[in-house]
Regions:
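A surface/secretory-pathway sequence property marking extracellular, secreted
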Residues: 375-419, 423-432, 469-471
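Serine/threonine-enriched low-complexity regions used as flexible
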Residues: 103-105, 110-149, 154, 247, ...
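Cleavable N-terminal signal peptides of Sec/SRP-targeted secreted and luminal proteins
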Residues: 3-22
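Long, solvent-exposed N-terminal ectodomains/accessory regions
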Residues: 18-242
């Protein structure tokens, strides 16, 4: 029996064993061009764990399941993001994420001390993903009341928000040390399948990159009598084609290599390419797709080219070649987009401004969540909407004042945005003095403020790529029209400059003191360690005598 035949039989045996156990694994890649010169690639790796096999790990990562089970987590969302998503130009991603690290989770109703479990959960995930989640404490954790709602099959609970905790670390940097443990959670790790395309050298050179882990419970049947655990690992990348210096793209240009086939343990391995823009900017896919899928969803028509990747070990390279290089491109803004920036001057008072633009022809209700750290105190009395202290646009509000070094400031507003309008939210803050131990490294660079969260039920699916709540794989969006489309979006981050002491002064004093000590040490050391002896001096010798003495030495 040949080696290839033996490997094939072992692979078939493992796949049949996994199918008996009930676990399934899917890997998908979605490629979508952005006008005028960007390309969005979205990876998702879905592992569905049967409730009967949840105690054993066949395809699911045991380390992650142990954390979810030990700390009694019903739903978990964790992302690490570098860069800023441009909602006005690019629309909405499949999973939106705030810059830096973001973590929020719902705990089961049996958990009484949620804060204690929350700290243990963040510490465990910090070690698993080599991130700084151990810095999550009570002073940077909030409990959202309206902005975040679970996406899993949770039992009805009126106090579901009391089991929720949310925290973000906007200063967190995403690096290779985070990607490596993330890939080790996959069944094929980085040796086979779509994860082989995730080259850290290529990923971290993109305009925007985000990795995430999302765990939730979903219904395995229509009546939800059976529940499966869904573990979804995602990677979102946005490439600037101007840097590549070509509108033509391929796997080799984007990821540095081709696709070495599908993961042998995957039930399905599919590549979707959005070719909707092919009507205005013609391009040709190489090789041609196996099939073309047309989708009508919420007033938006989308066309996808589908590739089914097989686990045969053959290298696969998909690319696009554009025809006209100077084609006219027009981008349509999404129904809602926003902007956020800092006001003020000096080191005493300032303000945070959030602009909400409703580009749709009907009113849209949104929830705005502002999360200010304890060192940036905001007051509800300073809130102004379109320059006015009172406004009919606010339907409901929730405000939790912060406490110095103990809890952050938390503000949520339920608003109704008028059609074709721009709504401006302004809230003032004060600058405070910190203890010198509380300043981060390079304090003069500034202090990062986390993103605001914008939650809305969109009336249209224009520029909307998120999956339905009941869907796991990407094919669930095909013709998935709904009365509304939930969107949880993040604004851009902000940075403020707090009053910072002159940390260079101690450095200068130390340098001066060390210099003085060094200059004084040499002479003092010589005086204390050397013996001073008088050197006898004779009569002075003239130059003529020195020459004569020299000749005498030569004669001798």
């Amino acid at each position: 029996m040949g080696r290839s035949t033996f490997i094939l039989r072992v692979t078939i045996f493992l796949i049949s064993l996994i199918c008996v156990q009930g676990d399934t694994f899917h890997e998908e890649l979605v490629i979508k061009p952005f006008l005028p010169a960007h390309l969005y690639t979205y990876f998702q790796f879905i592992t569905l764990v049967n409730s009967e096999s949840s105690e054993d790990t066949h395809l699911s990562p045991r380390s992650l399941l142990e954390i979810v089970s030990r700390f009694q987590v019903d739903e978990l969302h964790f992302t690490l993001t570098e860069g800023q998503w441009r909602h006005r130009q690019w629309g909405y991603p499949v999973f939106d994420a705030a810059p830096g690290a973001e973590l929020y989770a719902w705990f089961t109703s049996e958990v009484k001390d949620v804060d204690s479990q929350w700290k243990k959960l963040s510490a465990a995930l910090s070690g698993l993903f080599c991130a700084s989640l151990n810095f999550i404490e009570n002073f940077n954790t909030i409990t959202p009341q309206m902005a975040l709602w679970p996406m899993s099959a949770l039992p009805t609970n009126k106090n579901i928000t009391s089991q929720l905790r949310y925290a973000s670390l906007p200063r967190e940097i995403v690096c290779t040390e985070n990607l490596t443990p993330w890939k080790k959670l996959l069944p094929c790790e980085s040796s086979q399948g779509f994860s082989a395309l995730l080259n850290s050298r290529m990923i971290h050179n993109t305009n925007y990159h985000s990795i995430g882990v999302h765990v939730r419970k979903i219904c395995a049947s229509k009546d939800c009598s059976e529940i499966n655990l869904e573990i979804k690992q995602t990677v979102s990348l946005v490439y600037d084609l101007n840097i590549i210096k070509s509108m033509d793209w391929s796997f080799t240009k984007l990821f540095g290599q081709g696709l070495p086939g599908a993961c042998p343990l995957a039930t399905s391995s599919k590549v979707y390419v959005d070719v909707t823009s092919n009507a205005t900017r013609p391009f040709q896919l190489v090789p041609p797709p196996e099939s073309v899928i047309y989708s009508q969803r919420g007033g938006s028509d989308t066309t996808f080219a589908l590739y089914n990747i097989k686990a045969d070990g053959q290298m696969v390279t998909i690319g696009a070649k554009h025809g006209s290089k100077n084609a006219l491109t027009l981008s349509t803004p999404p129904p809602i987009y926003f902007n956020r920036y800092i006001l003020g001057y000096g080191k005493e008072f300032g303000g945070i401004v959030t602009e909400l633009i409703n580009n749709f022809w009907t009113p849209i209700e949104v929830v705005v969540l502002e999360n200010a750290p304890w060192w940036l105190p905001i007051q509800l009395s300073s809130l102004r909407i379109n320059g006015e202290a009172k406004s009919d646009l606010v339907l409901s509000r929730y405000y939790s004042p912060g406490r110095s070094r103990q809890k952050p400031y938390h503000l949520e507003l339920l608003m109704k945005l008028p059609p074709r309008s721009t709504t401006t939210l302004t809230i003032d803050f004060e600058f405070i003095f910190l203890k010198w131990q509380e300043y981060p490294p390079d304090a003069n660079h500034g202090f990062y403020v986390g993103s605001a969260i914008i939650t809305a039920n969109l009336p249209t699916a224009r520029n909307y790529t998120s999956l339905p709540i009941s869907g796991s794989t990407f094919d669930s969006i095909i013709n998935a029209s709904k009365p509304w489309y939930p969107a949880v979006l993040r604004t851009n981050g902000a940075m403020v400059s707090l009053p910072t002491p002159d940390f260079s002064m101690p450095y200068n004093v130390i340098c001066l003191a060390c210099t003085v000590v060094a200059l004084a040490f040499g002479p003092l050391h010589n005086i204390c360690t050397k013996e001073l002896v008088l050197k006898p001096t004779g009569t002075p010798v003239s130059l003529t005598q020195k020459i004569m003495n020299l000749f005498k030495k030569k004669q001798d």
